[in-house]
């Protein structure tokens, strides 16, 4: 699974427009100075495969195809959030001989409503060609149950909606139910998300792909913020892009280093001991 997701580097505040005002007392008309970085994350290997910069989050739509073009993703499963749920991106993934699982939200209202309607009535209608997968986990004092329901009968969707998506084979619903302890007793939370995919009818595989997508947030973006203080570094020009690339490379090395210590502790150990530093730089698995 290769997860594509963007992250705003808050410390990289200077945009192309802002450069024109450098050395003056004037301010750019647009407040959007921050740099936005789109990354490709190999979820199973814990490695950042590539990155491309944009100056606004909305530019992810044009940046993602460029990033995909630079990668060898043959036979991979590409997961992207709703921002990347675009026909051009789906076509690019299929052209690269890969599969996709794309989140569907209100940016494709008709498609979203049709999928939502199907999963509202499916338990009563009991349609055929449906796959269901359930899994429950406990951790951090909470119980979490995830249910994935997938259907490959695309005739439930409007023809204009599904025929324009390259390689589309299934649409799915992932329901997450959490029971979280609280001072006044357990609290229940429920979240429902919808997806389209080029994968064959396999609810377990789709559920696994969706689950792995979140590793880009937990294992990459969170680590860059907390362990490398990426958002607090004030950088200009290409420095922000270069530091982001070096930080991701260092993070991958630290993750594959055999020690069970945290990323922060591994960094300290490398700073204190040349032997540890050499061992990290010599990680063969990386």
Regions found by a protein language model. Give the residues of each.
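Conserved, well-structured functional cores that handle cations and Mg-NTP chemistry
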Residues: 1-80, 85-88, 260
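Short, hinge-like loop/turn segments at secondary-structure boundaries
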Residues: 20-21, 96, 117-121
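Generic secondary-structure signature for well-ordered alpha-helical cores
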Residues: 69, 98, 120, 124, ...
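Short, surface-exposed basic-aromatic patches at helix termini and helix-loop junctions that form
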Residues: 90-98
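Short hydrophobic alpha-helical runs that function as membrane-insertion/retention elements
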Residues: 99-104
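An anionic, glycine-rich sequence signature occurring as long contiguous blocks
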Residues: 105-211
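Short amphipathic alpha-helical "interface-anchor" segments enriched in bulky aromatics
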Residues: 200-234
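A short, flexible helix-boundary coil/loop motif
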Residues: 223-286
């Amino acid at each position: 699974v290769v997860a594509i997701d963007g992250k705003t580097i808050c410390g990289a505040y200077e945009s192309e427009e802002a450069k024109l005002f450098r050395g003056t007392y004037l301010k750019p008309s647009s407040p959007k100075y921050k740099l936005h970085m789109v990354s490709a994350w190999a979820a199973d290997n814990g490695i950042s495969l590539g990155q491309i910069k944009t100056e606004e989050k909305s530019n992810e739509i044009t940046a993602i195809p460029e990033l995909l073009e630079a990668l060898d993703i043959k036979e991979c499963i590409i997961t992207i959030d709703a921002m990347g749920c675009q026909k051009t991106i789906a076509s690019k993934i299929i052209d690269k001989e890969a599969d996709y699982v794309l989140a569907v939200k209100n940016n494709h209202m008709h498609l979203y409503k049709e999928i939502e309607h199907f999963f509202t009535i499916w338990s009563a209608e009991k349609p055929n060609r449906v796959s269901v997968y359930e899994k429950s986990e406990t951790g951090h004092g909470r119980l979490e149950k995830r249910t994935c329901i997938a259907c490959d009968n695309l005739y439930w969707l409007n023809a204009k909606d599904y025929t324009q998506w390259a390689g589309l084979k299934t649409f799915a619903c992932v329901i997450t139910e959490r029971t979280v302890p609280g001072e006044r007793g357990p609290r229940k939370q429920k979240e429902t998300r919808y997806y389209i995919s080029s994968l064959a009818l396999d609810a377990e595989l789709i559920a696994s792909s969706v689950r792995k997508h979140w590793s880009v947030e937990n294992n990459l973006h969170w680590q860059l913020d907390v362990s490398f203080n990426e958002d607090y570094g004030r950088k200009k020009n290409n420095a922000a892009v270069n530091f982001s690339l070096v930080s991701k490379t260092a993070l991958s090395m630290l993750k594959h280093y055999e020690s069970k210590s945290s990323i922060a502790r591994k960094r300290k150990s490398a700073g204190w001991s040349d032997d540890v530093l050499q061992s990290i730089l010599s990680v063969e698995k990386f």
